[in-house]
Design a protein with these regions (language model features):
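Long, contiguous juxta-domain segments that are non-catalytic but functionally important
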Residues: 20-47
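Boundary at the C-terminal end of the N-terminal hydrophobic targeting segment
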Residues: 15-19
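Long, well-structured alpha-helical subdomains associated
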Residues: 186-299, 304
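Surface-exposed patches in mature extracellular/periplasmic domains of secreted proteins
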Residues: 87-107, 161-169, 188-194, 261-268, ...
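Juxtacatalytic substrate-recognition/specificity segment
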Residues: 46-162
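Zinc-dependent metallopeptidase catalytic helix centered on the HExxH motif
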Residues: 133-207
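Bacterial N-terminal signal peptides
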Residues: 5-14
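Beta/coil-rich, acidic/histidine-enriched accessory regions frequently appended to metallopeptidases
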Residues: 24, 279-340
Length: 340
C-alpha cells in the first residue's frame, strides 16, 4: 500500500513537471512587486530578484544559485495549485502583483519583511513566502516529493473572489483548499499529523454541545483565533479556531458527497448567490444558510441532517420542510431568490 501511494505521488509530480529543469532569468527590479518596500530598503536588501518562470506563475528568489531541481519542483507544485484553484472555483484573482503577465510568488529573506510565514492578497495576485530559504529548501532535501502547504494557503487568499457571499469563512476557505491542492498535486505533506487533527475536529465538534454560529463565525462572541472546542475539564483544545472548524466541515462534505466534483459544484453555486455582509448574528446566519444551500445543491440532496442535526445549525420547522421538498438536482436554481 505504501509503495502504491509513493508511485501515485511520484506519477502525479512527474506528470506536471517541466521536461527540463527551470533556469533562472535575468535579475528584475522587484520594487513594485515586494509587499513592504520600506522594510527591504531599511534592511538594505537588493531589490534585484531572480525570476523562475512557470506555466502560470513567476517565482522570485534572491539567489540564482539554488538547485534547479528544487526550484523546478517547487514551481511545478505552485503551478498545479493555481490550476486547481482556477478549475474548482471557476474564477481567477484580479491582477495586482505580476511579472510579464504572470502572478508573482516571492521567496523573501527572513527578517520581518512580510506578514508572518507567508502573505497573500485577498482576491488579487501576489504571494510572499518567508520560510523558503530556512525551511523549505532543507525539507526538500529530506524529501524531494514534499511541498509546504502554506504555499497553497496563500494562493487561496488570492483566489478568494466571492466577496460577501462567503466572507465569514475567508481564512477557513484557504485552510480547506490548501488540502484540496495537496491532494491534486500528490506532494508529500510533512505536517500530515496536522491535517489528521483538523479532520478529526469535525467529529469532536459533532459530539460536543458547541453552538453552530459561535463555532463557525465571528458574530457570536468569539474572534477568529479563539478555540471553539473544550476538553472534558473545560480547557481549550488545541488547533480548533474558526478557520479550522470551517475547514474540517468542508473536508467532511468533500469526502462524503463527491470529492472535487462536489467542490466544483459548490463554488459554482456560491458564485450565483447574493452578497450578504455579515454585520450581526442574523446576517451571519443568512450567509450560513447560503453555505447550506450551496452544499445541498452540490450534493444533489438535502444536507440539513448534517448542518442542523449533526452541527446544530438552527432552522425552524418551516425551513426544514422547505429543504426536504426541494429538488436539489435542479440545475436552474435561482440562488438570489432563495436567499431573499
Amino acid at each position: 500500500m505504501k509503495l502504491f501511494s509513493f508511485l501515485l505521488s511520484f506519477g502525479c509530480l512527474w506528470a506536471m513537471a517541466p521536461a527540463e529543469p527551470l533556469k533562472p532569468g535575468a535579475p528584475v527590479d522587484a520594487s513594485k512587486i515586494v509587499f513592504d518596500l520600506r522594510a527591504w530598503q531599511d534592511a538594505k536588501l537588493s531589490l534585484q530578484l531572480i525570476p523562475w518562470e512557470g506555466r502560470n506563475l513567476s517565482f522570485l528568489t534572491t539567489d540564482d544559485k539554488l538547485d534547479p531541481a528544487m526550484v523546478t519542483h517547487f514551481v511545478a507544485c505552485l503551478d498545479k495549485g493555481w490550476e486547481t484553484y482556477a478549475d474548482l472555483t471557476g474564477r481567477k484573482p484580479s491582477p495586482f502583483k505580476n511579472l510579464n503577465g504572470k502572478p508573482t510568488v516571492t521567496a523573501v529573506p527572513p527578517g520581518n519583511l512580510t506578514c508572518g510565514a507567508g502573505c497573500g492578497y485577498v482576491g488579487a495576485t501576489g504571494v510572499e513566502l518567508a520560510l523558503f530559504y530556512d525551511r523549505d529548501v532543507a525539507e526538500w532535501k529530506m524529501d524531494p516529493l514534499s511541498f509546504p502547504h502554506y504555499g497553497f494557503y496563500e494562493l487561496g487568499r488570492n483566489f478568494y473572489t466571492f466577496g460577501d457571499r462567503h466572507s465569514c469563512f475567508i481564512t477557513g476557505y484557504a485552510v480547506f483548499m490548501r488540502y484540496v491542492c495537496m491532494d491534486a498535486v500528490g506532494a508529500h505533506d510533512l505536517e500530515l499529523d496536522l491535517r489528521k487533527h483538523i479532520e478529526r475536529m469535525e467529529e469532536v465538534y459533532a459530539n460536543s454541545s458547541a453552538p453552530f454560529l459561535r463555532t463557525f463565525t465571528m458574530l457570536d462572541g468569539l474572534d477568529e483565533k479563539a478555540a471553539r472546542l473544550k476538553d472534558a475539564k473545560g480547557n481549550d483544545l488545541p488547533t480548533c479556531d474558526q478557520p479550522v472548524m470551517y475547514a474540517t466541515a468542508m473536508l467532511k462534505l468533500r469526502k462524503d458527497y463527491g470529492g472535487d466534483v462536489w467542490v466544483k459544484k459548490f463554488f459554482s453555486a456560491l458564485a450565483k448567490c447574493p452578497e450578504i455582509k455579515p454585520t450581526d448574528k442574523a446576517s451571519a446566519q443568512r450567509q450560513c444558510l447560503a453555505w447550506l444551500i450551496c452544499s445541498s445543491h452540490a450534493a444533489g440532496r438535502d444536507l440539513t441532517p448534517i448542518f442542523c442535526d449533526r452541527w446544530r445549525m438552527e432552522l425552524d420547522k418551516a425551513q426544514r420542510d422547505w429543504f426536504k421538498k426541494r429538488d436539489w438536482s435542479d440545475a436552474d436554481f435561482d440562488f438570489d431568490k432563495l436567499l431573499k
